[in-house]
C-alpha cells in the first residue's frame, strides 16, 4: 500500500510539531515504530488517507465517533451553529438543553458543568471531592488512564499500602504521594489500601468498565463493594465514564451495571466529535463548585455553542431505536469471526467484548486486570497491527486499546475485516516477530 505522502508529511511534521504528532499514541511507539498514517477525510465507517487509501476504521478517534464519520445530523448541526457563531463567552440556550439531556440520561447527575476535555473533567471532580470531604488522598486502579493531569499520572507503589510514584517527568514526588494505586477487580487489595489510608482519602477514582488496558468488566460485586467500603471510610466514589458513557447503552456504564457513583466525569462520545468534557453528580457535592462554592473551575471554551450543538445532535442519533442492538450484533459477529480466524491460523488469542467494543489480546489466558493485559504478546500485536493496516483495516496502535464499532459499520465490513484478520494472523503465525 502506497503511503509516500504520509511519509513526507511525517518528516515535515517533525520539524514543527513535537515528535511529529499532537498526542503520543499517534506516533506508533506502541507497535515498534513506523510512519503514522495521515488522514484526509472520513465517511461513515471508513477514512481515507492523503494517498487515497481507504481503511475500515476501528479506531473511531479512540472512542468518540460512535455514529461514524461525518454523520449528516451532526454535520448539519455544526454547520448551522457555525453560521450563527461558535463562541460567545456567555450562557446559551444550548447549554441548558444539553445539560438537561445528560441529567435525564444519567440519573446520578443531579447537576452538571461543561469543560473542554475528559482530562479537565476528571481533574475537576478530584478537586471538588477534596473540597467536599476536606481530605486529600485519591485511590485509583492500576492501568486505568484518567487523562494527563499530574495527579493521575502516578504509577503504583510496591503494594496497596504504599504510595504511588511519578509516571511522567514533571510530576512531583509530593503529588505522587497523594495517590494510592491498587489492582482492578481485587477487592482485598482495595480493603488493604483503605485500612492504611481510608481516613485521608477524599475519593476513589474508577473506570466502571475499563477501557484503557482493553475492555475489562468488573467482577460481580466488585463495584458495589468499592462503593460500600469507600463510603464507610468517608470517601466519595468518582466514575470516569469518558470512554464508557453512551458506549454500551443510552446512558452511562453505571446505568448498564446498576451501580451509582457520587460523581461522574464525561467526554468523548458526548461531543459528537468536537472537544468536550463534563462532570456532575449529587447536588450537595456539585454546589461546592464556584460560583456557589469554594472549588474553582472555569473555562473560556467551556459550553461553547459548537460543541453543545454537536453533542445534542449526537445524542439525538443515539436515541434512535435499535442503535445499541446493532452494535452488539456486529460486535458478536466480529468476535466470533476473529476467534475462528485465529484458531485457523493457530494463533492463541483472548477477546474481551461488550456490545460494540472489544479488545484482542495475544494470549491464551483471560484478562481481568492490568497485569494480565501486560502479559499479552506485544510483539505479535505489532505484527498483526501492521498487517491489518496494509489490508486496509485501521486499529489503534497499541495492544491495550479497544476496537470501537460505529453504527455506520455493516456486516460486509465485519466480514471483510475477518478475512483480513485471517491473513494477518497467518503473518503472525509465520514468526515475523522477535
Curated annotation (Swiss-Prot):
One family name in Pfam for this protein: Aminotran_3
Record note on quaternary structure: Homodimer.
Pathway(s) = Porphyrin-containing compound metabolism; protoporphyrin-IX biosynthesis; 5-aminolevulinate from L-glutamyl-tRNA(Glu): step 2/2
What broad class of enzyme is this?
Answer: isomerase
Residue numbers carrying N6-(pyridoxal phosphate)lysine: 268
Q: Where is the signal peptide?
A: none
Q: Which GO terms describe its biological process?
A: protoporphyrinogen IX biosynthetic process
Q: What is this protein called?
A: Glutamate-1-semialdehyde 2,1-aminomutase 1
Where does the record place it?
A: Cytoplasm
Presence of keyword Nucleotide-binding: no
Q: What is its EC number?
A: 5.4.3.8
Amino acid at each position: 500500500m502506497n503511503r509516500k505522502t504520509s511519509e513526507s508529511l511525517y518528516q515535515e511534521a517533525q520539524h514543527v510539531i513535537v515528535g511529529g504528532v499532537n498526542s503520543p499514541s499517534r506516533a506508533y511507539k506502541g507497535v515498534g515504530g513506523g510512519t503514522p498514517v495521515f488522514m484526509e477525510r472520513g465517511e461513515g465507517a471508513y477514512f481515507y488517507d492523503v494517498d487515497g487509501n481507504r481503511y475500515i476504521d476501528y479506531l473511531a478517534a479512540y472512542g468518540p465517533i460512535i455514529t461514524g464519520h461525518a454523520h449528516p445530523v451532526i454535520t448539519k448541526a455544526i454547520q448551522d451553529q457555525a453560521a450563527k457563531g461558535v463562541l460567545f463567552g456567555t450562557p446559551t440556550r444550548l447549554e441548558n438543553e444539553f445539560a438537561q439531556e445528560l441529567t435525564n440520561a444519567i440519573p446520578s447527575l443531579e447537576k452538571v458543568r461543561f469543560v473542554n476535555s475528559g482530562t479537565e473533567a476528571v481533574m475537576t471532580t478530584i478537586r471538588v471531592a477534596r473540597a467536599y470531604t476536606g481530605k486529600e488522598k485519591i485511590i485509583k486502579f492500576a492501568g486505568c488512564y484518567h487523562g494527563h493531569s499530574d495527579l493521575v499520572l502516578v504509577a503504583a507503589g510496591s503494594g496497596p499500602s504504599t504510595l504511588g510514584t511519578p509516571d511522567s517527568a514533571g510530576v512531583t514526588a509530593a503529588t505522587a504521594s497523594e495517590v494510592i494505586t491498587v489492582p482492578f477487580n481485587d477487592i482485598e487489595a482495595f480493603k488493604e489500601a483503605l485500612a492504611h489510608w481510608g481516613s485521608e482519602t477524599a475519593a476513589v477514582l474508577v473506570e466502571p468498565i475499563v477501557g484503557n488496558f482493553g475492555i475489562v468488566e468488573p467482577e460481580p460485586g466488585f463495584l458495589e463493594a468499592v462503593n460500600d467500603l469507600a463510603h464507610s471510610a468517608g470517601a466519595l466514589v468518582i466514575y470516569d465514564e469518558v470512554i464508557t458513557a453512551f458506549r454500551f447503552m443510552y446512558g452511562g456504564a453505571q446505568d448498564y451495571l446498576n451501580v451509582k457513583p457520587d460523581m461522574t466525569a464525561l467526554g468523548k462520545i458526548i461531543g459528537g466529535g468536537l472537544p468536550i468534557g463534563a462532570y456532575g453528580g449529587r447536588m450537595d457535592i456539585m454546589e461546592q463548585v464556584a460560583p456557589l462554592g469554594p472549588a474553582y473551575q472555569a473555562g473560556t471554551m467551556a459550553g461553547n455553542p459548537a460543541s453543545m450543538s454537536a453533542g445534542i445532535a449526537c445524542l439525538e442519533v443515539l436515541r434512535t431505536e435499535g442503535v445499541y442492538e446493532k452494535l452488539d450484533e456486529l460486535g458478536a459477529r466480529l468476535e466470533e469471526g476473529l476467534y475462528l480466524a485465529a484458531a485457523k491460523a493457530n494463533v492463541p488469542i483472548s477477546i474481551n467484548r461488550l456490545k460494540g467494543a472489544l479488545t484482542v489480546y495475544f494470549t491464551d489466558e483471560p484478562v481481568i486486570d492490568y497485569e494480565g493485559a501486560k502479559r499479552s504478546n506485544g510483539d505479535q500485536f505489532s505484527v498483526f497491527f501492521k498487517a491489518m493496516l496494509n489490508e486496509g483495516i485501521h486499529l489503534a496502535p497499541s495492544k491495550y486499546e479497544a476496537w470501537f464499532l460505529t453504527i455506520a459499520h455493516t456486516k460486509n465490513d465485519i466480514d471483510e475485516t475477518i478475512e483480513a484478520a485471517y491473513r494477518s494472523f497467518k503473518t503472525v503465525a509465520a514468526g515475523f516477530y522477535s
